[in-house]
Amino acid sequence: MLFDQIASNKRKTWILLLVFFLLLALVGYAVGYLFIRSGLGGLVIALIIGFIYALSMIFQSTEIVMSMNGAREVDEQTAPDLYHVVEDMALVAQIPMPRVFIIDDPALNAFATGSNPQNAAVAATSGLLAIMNREELEAVMGHEVSHIRNYDIRISTIAVALVSAITMLSGMAGRMMWWGGAGRRRSDDDRDGNGLEIIMLVVSLLAIVLAPLAATLVQLAISRQREFLADASSVELTRNPQGMINALDKLDNSKPMSRHVDDASSALYINDPKKGGGFQKLFYTHPPISERIERLKQM
């Protein structure tokens, strides 16, 4: 079961790469068509940017993601309780000891990152450490260590990189359009242009607006399914389903994180760090905690 999941996650990594690079190529082509009169040129530039983003995240994911989330590294002397729990979970999971970080935030949350089990790290908020008892902390860290063991972190890391690249390119195009960089240039071309030019203009604008949304939805679909598996894997490590249930119950009652968490990083956390309501529920990075608890009760 476990080895099948690891193999599945490795296959999903390549599928994920393909989908995100297709979206990136679409945005690049649209930006190139609108601003430099060369869709192909924009496509090539976008793919180069995406490749650099993905490569940098693979080799420097821990430093980049921890910096993005304001985490500080700790050790056995500065955070002995957290360090020893992570050490125990890593030993049971038979993976190398990950680096350990703390985020100074009163909300209850945690995440794991890295490109593989040999280059991984976990982070927990100060609020989580203050509220969770030992069994609950073991359950949460077992969840994060499971993400490492199951190679979920590689998928998450690549997703963060490529969603960031797509969002950056779309945002750049939006600012240039705001200042009229493409509007004046293309309006002169299209005033006497044919229907194809107008269609290309509309499609390019839609690509710039919708590609970040599409990339986020792909990331969410992958993230939600992984959370169920990590919950179950944590119970496998701790042999304590009630500890995971109690931890999830406390996470459900936690407030949103006080510090800003960008959309690309939200999917990394065990608990949705934003917790919006209404329309925002469509873009939750995690399945409802009540559903996660119900699945654990059925184990």
Swiss-Prot record:
Required co-factors: Zn(2+)
Bilayer topology: Multi-pass membrane protein
Segments passing through the bilayer: 15-35, 39-59, 158-178, 198-218
GO cellular component: plasma membrane
Binding note for cofactor: Binds 1 zinc ion per subunit.
Annotated positions binding Zn(2+): H143, H147, E227
Molecular function as annotated in GO: metalloendopeptidase activity; zinc ion binding
UniProt entry keywords in alphabetical sequence: Cell membrane, Hydrolase, Membrane, Metal-binding, Metalloprotease, Protease, Transmembrane, Transmembrane helix, Zinc
Keyword Transmembrane: yes
Catalytic residue list: E144
Pfam families in the record: Peptidase_M48
Subcellular locations according to the entry: Cell membrane
Enzyme Commission number: 3.4.24.-
Gene3D superfamilies referenced in this protein's UniProt entry, alphabetically: Metalloproteases ('zincins'), catalytic domain
Single biological process term from Gene Ontology: proteolysis
Family: Belongs to the peptidase M48B family.
HAMAP family the UniProt entry points to: Pept_M48_protease_HtpX
Name of the molecule in the record: Protease HtpX homolog
Species in which this protein is naturally found: Streptococcus pneumoniae serotype 2 (strain D39 / NCTC 7466)
